[in-house]
Amino acid sequence: MNTFTRTKVPFVPLEGNRVGWYICGPTVYDSAHMGHARNYVNFDVLRRVMSDYFRYDVRFIMNVTDIDDKIVMRAHLRRSEAVLAKVRDGEHTELADALRALLASGERDLGEQERLTKALATSVGDPDASEWSIQTAYLELAHKFEAEFMEDMRLMGVAKPDMLTRVSEYTDKIVTYIQQIINRGYAYASNGSVYFDVPSFENAPNHKYAKLNKAALENVELAMDGEGALAADASEKRAENDFVLWKKSKPGEPAWDSPWGMGRPGWHIECSAMCSDVLGETVDINGGGIDLNFPHHENQLAQSEAFYDCEQWVNTFVHTGHLHIDGLKMSKSLKNFITIGAALKMYSARQIRFLFLLHQWCDPMDLTPVAARDKETGDERVVGFAQMEQAVAIEKVFVEFFHQVKGVMRLTPGGYS
């Protein structure tokens, strides 16, 4: 299924038998859940079919998003909570109460949060009070969850990508990439940030915005979600559909130098720069979960076509379907997710892979958790999924079949010994 055409079309590589394939990897701020497992298992199966059955020479690239607002906010939260845990009852109440109130308010003033946390850390004698820095703390957090994600993939039987790219290793190239888009006339600087000029791109004779999602120009709210939780005021934009390429960093946020001032990359430009650096000006396949269709992939496509000033950068887009829990998308924001680690305590990786194979990879899939009450704590916890019964039965047939084949081969003259 090619998302460009929304139909099944014959796949034809751009260059002989070689296939350049880029998929969007995890944003590493928390443990991966079953929705992630379905996404990467599906791509693993598709990749194996392409390379092992059709014998394409596949170059499979995956990125790790290790610069992101979610990571920055989580790093600050973990630091604040760690310092608050050291406060004894009745001590440093003014600072502690002020920090707790800020966290409870939901305000995203990371500069003030960092100031209060540092002051409280100094008061309680925390040894890291003067050393802690968001510039290093966010990356330590990202490294932790990247390692956990890669171990989850290993346990799930997902083959490693041929190349893994990290945003933190590409900041200089991202700056150069953005400058080229500005030089082409499709981006502009505003108050230390840089924005993609959607109207200029849309009005160019050889370009078109909203190729993947025809409603993209109308869905401003979803577009804003793609700007990140720490996005600047929308008044900096010339048009409401414009999106950020480079974010001016505020106090409490990590920052890198650029011609426009200290800041960090926007989400969409990260993939454009990394994919272009590895695969160049034409890409056979770009993939990810269906939630990335818009705004991420739509904007990634526009940026790259602006950079190369070409009509089509990607030949085929493939998107895997959502995994739902009782009809709702599994996500960390909804807090209805089951981690891969927890699922592997209930079922084997092979059983989970069979479960995913029972559903069309590009369609939504629904899971119904089976809960039981813990005898010791009295709390309810998920102990399985109603849909797993068929997958477990299939695995049993699979194991028995190959056990019999193995036995026949041993007894057959000329068979293996």
What are these model-predicted stretches?
Residues 1-316, 386, 404, 409-416:
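NTP-dependent nucleotidyl-transfer catalytic core
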Residues 111, 311, 319-416:
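Catalytic adenosine-cofactor/nucleotide-binding cores of aminoacyl-tRNA synthetases and other
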